[in-house]
Amino acid sequence: MAITKSTPAPLTGGTLWCVTIALSLATFMQMLDSTISNVAIPTISGFLGASTDEGTWVITSFGVANAIAIPVTGRLAQRIGELRLFLLSVTFFSLSSLMCSLSTNLDVLIFFRVVQGLMAGPLIPLSQSLLLRNYPPEKRTFALALWSMTVIIAPICGPILGGYICDNFSWGWIFLINVPMGIIVLTLCLTLLKGRETETSPVKMNLPGLTLLVLGVGGLQIMLDKGRDLDWFNSSTIIILTVVSVISLISLVIWESTSENPILDLSLFKSRNFTIGIVSITCAYLFYSGAIVLMPQLLQETMGYNAIWAGLAYAPIGIMPLLISPLIGRYGNKIDMRLLVTFSFLMYAVCYYWRSVTFMPTIDFTGIILPQFFQGFAVACFFLPLTTISFSGLPDNKFANASSMSNFFRTLSGSVGTSLTMTLWGRRESLHHSQLTATIDQFNPVFNSSSQIMDKYYGSLSGVLNEINNEITQQSLSISANEIFRMAAIAFILLTVLVWFAKPPFTAKGVG
C-alpha cells in the first residue's frame, strides 16, 4: 500500500538558498569525483606499486558501478523515499571516500571506488528532483540553471584540483575532500528538509534483471580492464568473462523486453529519435571520455608535466560551456537541434584532427590548450540538443525512464571508452616502439652520427642507448595517441550523418 503525504509548500528565502547550495554541492561532489582522479593516475599507480594501465581501473571501476546504480535509483526512491535515499547515498559516498583515501593497495582502493560509484549513482537524479520539488514552479527554470552550473564547473575543477593535491599533498586527499562536503550536505538537508519526504510505495525490485545487468556490465568491464595484462583471448579468464558477459547481456535484453517491471525500459527504443539520440550520445561520449583520460597521462609521460600542469592543460575545455550553455538553454529551441549537434560533432572532429597533426613531445603549452579551448564549443552544443532529440516524441510519463536510460548509457560508455582507449594506446605504442627500434642499427647513418655526438655527453654506449630508448618511447606514445585522435575525428564525422535521421519537431508532443 502506498504511503501518501500532502505536498509541502515550496521553500522560500534563505532556507531555499541553503537547500540549493546543499543539493548543488552534492552534485558538485559527484561530478568532481568523476574527473579529479584523471590526472592522478600516474601518482596513485606509482604509490601503490601498480602499472598505469592498472591505475585506470580507479576510473573505470567507479564509472561502471555508477552506471549500474542509475537504473535502480527510481525504484529505490519509490520504495524508501527520495530524501531518505539521497541522505543514505551521501553518507556512504562520504564514508567510501574516506576509505579510498586510506587504501594501501590497489585492490582495496578499487573495492571502495566501486562502493563510491554505487553510492554516486543516485546523487545527480535525486538532487535534481529534490531541488525541483522544493522550488516554486515559476522559479524552477532558474533552479535548473543554478544546478546545471555545478555540472559544468565540477569537471573543470576536477583535474586542476587533483593535480594541485597530488603535487602538494598526499594523493589520498583527492578522495578525502569529499568528507567535509558530505558533512555539509547532510547537515543542511537533515535540518532544512525535515518532514519533506516524498511519497513511497512497496514497488518490487527486479532482482533477475539487476543480477543480469551486474553480470553483463561488470563482466564486460573487467574483461576490458584485464584483457591486456592477460593477453586477451589467449587467457581462459578473458574467455570466461566474455562468455558470461555476452550471455548475461543477451538474457538481460530478453528478460527486460518481457518484464512488467523492467530496470531498463527497452520499449523506448521504439522511438526513432530516442534511438538516434542514445546511439549518438553513447558513441560520442565513448571517444570523448577516452580522450580526456588519455590527455593528462600523455602529457605526464611524454612531456614531463606534473599533475597540476596536466590539469591546467585540460581546463580550457570548460570555458566556453560555462559561457554558452545558458544561452543554448534559453534560445536553443529556436534552432533545429540537428544543426547544433552537427556543429558540435564537426567541432569535435576538427579539434581531434588538429590535435592529431600538431601533438608531439616538443609542442608548447599554447599548442596544447588551443584545441582544448575550441573543443569547448563542441561540448556546449552537445548534451542539451542530443537530450532534447532523445526525449522528443515521448509522453511525459516516459521522461523519468528515458533520463535513466540516457544517463546509464552515457556513464557506461565513459568507462568502456576509457578502457578501450588505454588498451589501444598501449598496443599501438608497443607496435610503434618495435618498428622504430628496428631502424636503430649500425647501418643507419643517422644513428651512427647521433650516437657519436651523444657519446660525448653520456660517456658510454649504454647511456646513449638508454637515452635513445626513452626518445623512442616518447615518440611511440605520441604517434599512438595521434592515431586515436584521428580515429575520434573520423567517428564524429560519421555521427553527423546519423543525427540527420532524427525526425522533427523536437518537442514532447512530436512524433518520434
From Swiss-Prot:
This is Probable multidrug resistance protein EmrY. GO terms for cellular component: efflux pump complex; periplasmic side of plasma membrane; plasma membrane. It is a multi-pass membrane protein. Keywords: Cell inner membrane, Cell membrane, Membrane, Transmembrane, Transmembrane helix, Transport. Disulfide bonds: none annotated. GO terms for molecular function: transmembrane transporter activity. Residues 1-8, 52-53, 163-172, 226-234, 295-307, 360-364, 508-512 are cytoplasmic. Its main location: membrane. CDD domains: MFS_LmrB_MDR_like (cd17503). It comes from Escherichia coli (strain K12). Part of the tripartite efflux system EmrYK-TolC, which confers resistance to various drugs. Pfam families: MFS_1. Part of the tripartite efflux system EmrYK-TolC, which is composed of an inner membrane transporter, EmrY, a membrane fusion protein, EmrK, and an outer membrane component, TolC. The complex forms a large protein conduit and can translocate molecules across both the inner and outer membranes. Induction: Growth phase-dependent transcription is induced by tetracycline. Expression may be controlled by both RpoS and the Mar system. It is found in: Cell inner membrane. Disruption phenotype: Mutants are more sensitive to nalidixic acid, mitomycin C and other stresses such as hydrogen peroxide or UV irradiation. Residues 30, 75-84, 127-141, 194-204, 256-273, 329-338, 386-486 are periplasmic. The chain crosses the membrane at residues 9-29, 31-51, 54-74, 85-105, 106-126, 142-162, 173-193, 205-225, 235-255, 274-294, 308-328, 339-359, 365-385, 487-507. PROSITE patterns: MFS. InterPro entries: EmrB-like (IPR004638), MFS (IPR011701), MFS_dom (IPR020846), MFS_trans_sf (IPR036259). One of its GO terms (biological process) is response to antibiotic. Belongs to the major facilitator superfamily. EmrB family.
